[in-house]
């Protein structure tokens, strides 16, 4: 974040791996502290908290600590924290969840959590449609920032 001192928008997504070993209350408390630190360093930036993404049904079955119901509980707590602290909340999970609330299997053929280039485009398109001045964000901006998915700020 310090690489972009004039950031106008900062997008944060944490949690996919941590929910397996960090309790919800501790997770949300530490997430809030992290966001507050960002706000102190970038008081004029809009800060967007992104929901934790769902996992595939096969990941959920093989690793129950990553249950999508648990992810939904963490996301509800993140939404409440974001509202209390006046941060924007983006329910990115809605762009990835299938009719059962799972990440489609083809989205993450390797580990059931992390997806490939096609789904980074889905993420990028979601962000463009759900932030202010989304027409000012382009794929060229993402490439310029060194990201294959979307601009970090």
Range-by-range predicted roles:
Residues 1-3, 32-41:
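Short amphipathic alpha-helices and their capping/turn segments at secondary-structure boundaries
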Residues 1-28, 52-58:
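Oxyanion-hole/transition-state-stabilizing segment in secreted/luminal serine hydrolases
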Residues 11, 48, 88-90:
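Hydrophobic/aromatic beta-strand patches that form the interior of the parallel beta-sheet core
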Residues 13, 37-41, 81:
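Short hydrophobic alpha-helical module
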Residues 24-34, 68-74:
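Charged helix-capping and loop-helix junction motifs
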Residues 42-46:
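A short helix->loop->beta-strand "cap" motif at the edges of active sites that frequently abuts
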Residues 54-150:
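Catalytic His-Asp segment of secreted/periplasmic serine-dependent ester chemistry enzymes
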């Amino acid at each position: 974040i310090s690489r972009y001192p004039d950031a106008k928008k900062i997008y944060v997504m944490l949690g996919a791996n941590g929910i397996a070993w960090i309790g919800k209350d501790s997770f949300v408390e530490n997430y809030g502290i992290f966001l507050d630190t960002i706000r102190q360093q970038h008081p004029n930036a809009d800060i967007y908290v992104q929901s934790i993404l769902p996992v595939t049904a096969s990941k959920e079955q093989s690793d129950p600590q990553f249950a999508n119901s648990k992810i939904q509980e963490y996301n509800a707590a993140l939404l409440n924290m974001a509202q209390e602290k006046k941060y924007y909340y983006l329910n990115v999970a809605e762009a990835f969840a299938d009719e059962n609330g799972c990440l489609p299997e083809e989205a993450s053929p390797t580990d059931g959590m992390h997806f490939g280039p096609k789904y980074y485009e889905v993420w990028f398109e979601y962000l463009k449609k759900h932030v202010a001045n989304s027409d000012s964000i382009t794929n060229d901006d993402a490439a310029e920032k060194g990201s294959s998915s979307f601009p970090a700020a």
